[in-house]
Amino acid sequence: MTESESAAVPVDAAAFREAMSRLASAVHLITTDGPGGRAGFTASAVCSVSDAPPTLLVCINRASSAYAALTQNGTLCVNTLGEGHETVASLFGGRTPVDERFAAGTWRRLRSGAPALADALVSFDCRIVGRHAVGSHDVLYCAVEAVAASGQADALLYSERRYRTLPRAPRSGSAPAEPARAARAVGARPAEGPALALRSA
């Protein structure tokens, strides 16, 4: 077998998931509300596409319980979580009924009407402007129409199948801070989490 032929052999899905579990990712709640109903899920597959115009990329499994509402509403809010949000992240990442998911937080509405978590580190209110199917998922291109930053907690990360926190950096000009701390694990490994955002509840 030549080197090029060897490279063409598909990577085992389990091996890929294990490799991806070693990447530390921010944790987000993706929420929506509108004609298709209220829904939400926990995701780590979120990133910036452009700042001209401001655009985010969000991935969702087409088997997700939130998929129908999200696509029908055409809007969503990306709520980036911080320390103390482990419970709500786990609720939105499992099979918890929708009403119980939203009962775990305090919500407000931004421009689109999608629920924005009041104490999220930051909430990006978006309109879905493009969609591309890749395997089991849709890649959504989301135009950011409003931003609300209110949370002051350390960032919440998901790595090695558990939640961890990353301390905030000191502001420029502030008093000398303690030596930088490594990201620390938070609580027990959750039964469900954002995983790779390859699977969304």
From Swiss-Prot:
Keywords: Flavoprotein, FMN, NAD, Oxidoreductase. Pfam families: Flavin_Reduct (PF01613). Its EC number is 1.5.1.42. It comes from the Bacteria. InterPro entries: Flavin_Rdtase-like_dom, NADH-dep_flavin_reductase, RutF, Split_barrel_FMN-bd. Belongs to the non-flavoprotein flavin reductase family. RutF subfamily. This is FMN reductase (NADH) RutF 1. It comes from Methylorubrum extorquens (strain CM4 / NCIMB 13688) (Methylobacterium extorquens).
